[in-house]
UniProtKB/Swiss-Prot annotation:
Probable neurotoxin with ion channel impairing activity. Residues 1-19 form the signal peptide. This is Toxin ICK-12. It is found in: Secreted. Expressed by the venom gland. The presence of a 'disulfide through disulfide knot' structurally defines this protein as a knottin. It comes from the Eukaryota. One of its GO terms (cellular component) is extracellular region.
Length: 88
């Protein structure tokens, strides 16, 4: 029983420390499209180098997208967030 509790704590801390793609809007509907270079767009929560690589949200009036640094990660990641949110 003790080992199960330790395993659950380890998994919880791992998700908290490393983050999860859902933190970047992965649950918000987005368009998975092919880019002009033939590659697929990058999903929210995954590494990118510029905004043009990221998948766009289906509802562009409510949501915006981009490629930026997350507080918990050193690299840039794609994100989708609500335009009215102060966290965007």
């Amino acid at each position: 029983m003790k080992s199960i509790v330790y395993m659950l704590l380890f998994c919880t801390f791992t998700v908290v420390i490393l983050g999860h793609p859902n933190d970047h809007g992965a649950l918000i509907p987005y368009r998975a499209e092919k880019l002009p270079n033939g590659e697929w767009c990058i999903r929210p929560g995954y590494s990118c180098s510029e905004r043009g690589q990221c998948c766009m949200p289906v509802d562009g009036d409510t949501y915006t997208y981009g490629c930026g640094r997350a507080w918990s990660e050193g690299s840039k990641v794609c994100f989708i967030c609500n335009r009215e949110s102060s966290m965007c």
